Swiss-Prot record:
The keyword Transmembrane helix applies. GO terms for cellular component: membrane. Pfam families: p450. This is Cytochrome P450 monooxygenase paxQ. PROSITE patterns: CYTOCHROME_P450. Disulfide bonds: none annotated. Its cofactor is heme. The chain crosses the membrane at residues 3-23, 35-55. Keywords: Heme, Iron, Membrane, Metal-binding, Monooxygenase, Oxidoreductase, Transmembrane, Transmembrane helix. CDD domains: CYP503A1-like. Its main location: membrane. Pathway: Secondary metabolite biosynthesis. It comes from the Eukaryota.
């Protein structure tokens, strides 16, 4: 990747590091091959086949996962990485069996810790650290979600207010003429404003440094994490000193700890945001167990997932809208109707935009972030009911991308249908099962089971609010009508073009 190459070019020790990393990777892979995992192998054949496939993983991972799903979709298969085997569990019963296991059997945080090198990029939240649990963070987000739905609670109106403030700050569209919107850059900053409002509240969310740090941290975690992961454990403390995520994390920690102290001086900590709610809930229910440091660490770790993934879905939606004009007017009609029926930009109005919700979900389905989902590491030997044993230390995942393009599950899956999920909801009489934030084993974008993404409801509100605002106030097109910007792939991950722009032009007549 570009960030890896540029990092190596900046440092005189780059060549030596590559040699050391290569030796370490070969040693690790040789050691991992001794693990006996009795599932079919997918990749190059022959004595050197696994080595070649491992070297091609960065560019061929999604193809290998698709091939494995097509050949072994009723069971499981393994693929070779430079330092280990990974096992893809395809069988529905087996997925159901492992997705709800406790972390002391199949650990999700272990995967995240290794992929993004959380020990260095989000210290205090790595595997084994004393930290706020994911279920407790989920409880906090559920509290906030319930506030959004409560008619007499000001939270959602404040959320809309924050969006309008962020849009005005970040998107200077002229009254006349075109405006080139840098989709990812601007989207990330707007989402950072909203994430800050949710996590740390007003007025801290209006602090320009906080917005900058939230935005930068969302990008720094994957780039720093991927770079640090290239090196043996003994070199990582040294390498981390050259990466931005640890520095940003340290600065955020200082600001948030200072905020706690300030709130106490000014009369106490109120439950008006996630940070305050966690402080009060833990004081009341688990006094003395968690300090300010554990709470602020959990807030910081939440930032990456909250900003980067939400922004990517938003960008895909903008690209699809700009190149599929047939959806624009019908969606505007629905948005206008929902706003009029419910009295403006209120929670009920956003929930009434069911075709817009379907369009967003189809954009996500058609451009799946990860070819896999439900990634776990076996923390002890585990035997499935069908007799397959997964050795301790093995990484497993379930197919995601291949499921979303399986014609037996999604008819004409290679065709984009913005109303696909709306129609499925109407046909089955269960519209809630097909909303953007809904999950099941046929739609694993947010995971499923024990570690389902707890922030998906907030992401849904953010994306619907932004797209509805754009549709009602602007015409949208690609630059020079050149077509949809191309996605790019790294390993199993698919990214939108992060440099691409769309053209916004203020509409002459806006009734919303």
């Amino acid at each position: 990747m570009d960030f890896v190459l540029s990092a190596l070019q900046r440092d005189s020790w780059g060549i030596a590091a590559i040699i050391l990393v290569s030796i370490w990777a070969l040693h690790s892979f040789h050691r991992s091959r001794k693990l006996q995992i009795p599932v079919p192998y997918v990749g190059k054949c022959g004595i050197l086949g696994p080595w070649i496939s491992a070297l091609q993983w960065e560019s061929k991972a999604r193809e290998l996962v698709q091939e494995g799903y097509e050949k072994h979709g009723n069971f499981a298969f393994k693929v070779a990485l430079l330092n280990r085997w990974e096992v893809c569990i395809c069988n529905e019963d087996m997925i159901r069996e492992y997705k709800n296991l406790m972390d002391n059997q199949f650990s999700a945080i272990a995967v995240t810790s290794e992929l993004f090198q959380i020990k260095w990029t989000a210290p205090g939240t790595e595997e084994g650290a004393h930290k706020i649990s994911i279920p407790l963070l989920g409880k906090a987000l559920t509290w906030q979600r319930n506030r959004s739905a409560a008619q007499n609670d000001p939270y959602f109106s404040e959320f809309v207010e924050e969006f309008l403030y962020a849009w005005k700050e970040e998107v200077p569209v002229p009254e006349n003429g075109d405006y080139e919107l840098p989709c990812f850059e601007t989207g990330a900053r707007v989402v950072a404003h909203l994430t800050a409002r949710s996590l740390v509240g007003y007025p801290l969310c209006r602090n320009p440094e906080i917005v900058n740090l939230f935005t930068d941290y969302g990008s720094a975690v994957p780039t720093s994490g991927f770079f640090i992961a290239m090196f043996p454990e003994i070199m990582k403390p040294f390498v981390a000193n050259f990466c931005s995520a640890p520095r940003i994390s340290k600065r955020l920690q200082a600001i948030l700890l200072e905020e706690f102290a300030k709130r106490r001086e000014e009369g106490g900590i109120e439950s008006t945001d996630i940070m305050g709610w966690l402080r009060n809930w833990t004081d009341q229910n688990e006094p003395g167990v968690y300090g300010d440091l554990e709470i602020t660490s959990s807030i910081i770790a939440t930032i990456f997932g909250a900003i980067h993934t939400t922004t990517q879905v938003l960008v895909h939606c903008l690209f699809e809208l700009a190149t599929r004009p047939e959806y624009v007017e019908p969606l505007r009609v629905e948005i206008q109707s929902a706003l009029e029926e419910h009295g403006g930009w209120v929670k009920e109005g956003i929930e009434g935009m069911v075709k817009l919700d379907s369009f967003i979900k189809e954009c996500q389905r058609f451009n799946p972030l990860d070819a896999g989902s439900l990634a776990r590491r076996a923390t002890k030997d585990f035997t499935f009911k069908n007799g397959l044993t997964i050795p301790e230390g093995t990484f497993v995942f379930a197919p995601n991308g291949p499921i979303l393009f399986d014609d037996t599950l999604y008819p004409e899956a290679r065709q984009f249908d913005g109303y696909r999920f709306y129609n499925l909801g109407q046909k089955t009489g269960k519209p809630q099962d097909f909303r953007f934030a809904a999950t099941n084993q046929k739609y694993l974008q947010f995971g499923d089971g024990r570690h389902t993404c707890p922030g998906r409801w907030m992401a849904s509100d953010e994306i619907r609010l932004m797209l509805a605002h754009i549709l009602m106030n602007y015409d949208i097109a690609t630059k020079d009508n050149k077509g949809r910007p191309e996605n790019w792939i790294f390993k199993k991950i698919l990214f939108p073009d992060m440099k691409a722009v769309v053209i916004l032009k203020a509409r002459k007549s806006v009734s919303a």
